[in-house]
Amino acid sequence: MGGESTYEEAGVSLATADAVVERLRAAVESTGAEGFGAFAGLYPLDDHRLLAASMDSIGTKPMLARERGLLRNCGADMAAHCINDVLTCGAEPLFLLDYDAPNRLDLGQVAELVEGAAEVCRAAGCALVGGETAELPGVYREGELDFAATCVGLVERDDLIDGARVEPGDAVVGLPSAGVHANGFSLVRRVLESEDYEGDELLAPTRLYLDDVRALRRETDVRALAHVTGGGVEGNLSRVLPEGLNARIDWESWERPPVFQWLARHVAEDELRRVFNLGIGYCAVVADPAGRVVIGRIE
């Protein structure tokens, strides 16, 4: 049975985040930027190639990961999250920069985060070229930190995936997540006040989808890609679909990992779908699903 906990009550407003994006749109687009509001911003390198860039923060997951001795997972999260965003436009990752901002510098803590990020970068063939470490007493409380990263990739203009060719009847292929990944932890921590959870998928690092995306592109015509982060499956698919088209999701077409069954005891179904990936970490819109798990259709 769904409970009463919501993301808003936990201190995070997705509606306000959406409003901020729209408020900033004119200023950002006035600089000549392409792809504002997409998973990755685009910059023309020359007539044939585009740079794709994405930046994100790990949010409040480190607060829980540190308590359980799994801070390294958050470094892996951050690298995978940014690389996954860049993949959505068809780009290959080139390099990553990281930003670590704790209340006070802790060598072991910084090393865990950067080593976790480096492990994912090695797997992706993406260079970790540098970053910034800032000690910010007075900004964060004792023991608190922020960890962010920026990934830059490269895509040939002819290979760009932007959702423009999506048509009614196209299939939505769902790729499984490793667990909660890196979104919704303010709400997770609120639920933990009522009931503990020890399963590995709660703090498992974000899955890297590079090999999956490459395989899909070899096997079938990929028309859009969505990284399922804050906003859930439907919210993130809507970011890559042409105006007037929607994704009808069959929520019974896959089995949810146990961590989401635990959350469902405290969070209403609509809120679960709006905040969490619910076991689907990445979506591809394709004409032919090529034997993959279909979780919905475009209409």
Regions found by a protein language model. Name each.
Residues 180, 188, 297-299:
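Flexible glycine-rich active-site/ligand-binding loops centered on an Asp-His dyad
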Residues 2-11, 20, 26, 108-127, ...:
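Glycine-/charge-enriched secondary-structure boundary and capping motifs
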Residues 185-196:
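Short, compositionally biased
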Residues 160-163, 183-187:
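A short secondary-structure junction signal
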Residues 14:
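Conserved "HGTGT" condensation-loop signature of ketosynthase/thiolase-family condensing enzymes
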Residues 17, 58-62, 156-159, 180-182, ...:
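Short, acidic Gly/Pro/Ser/Thr-rich loop/turn segments
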Residues 172-180, 225-230:
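A structural signal for small-residue-enriched, beta-sheet-centric alpha/beta enzyme cores
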Residues 23-178:
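Glycine-rich phosphate/pyrophosphate-binding loop regions near the starts of catalytic domains
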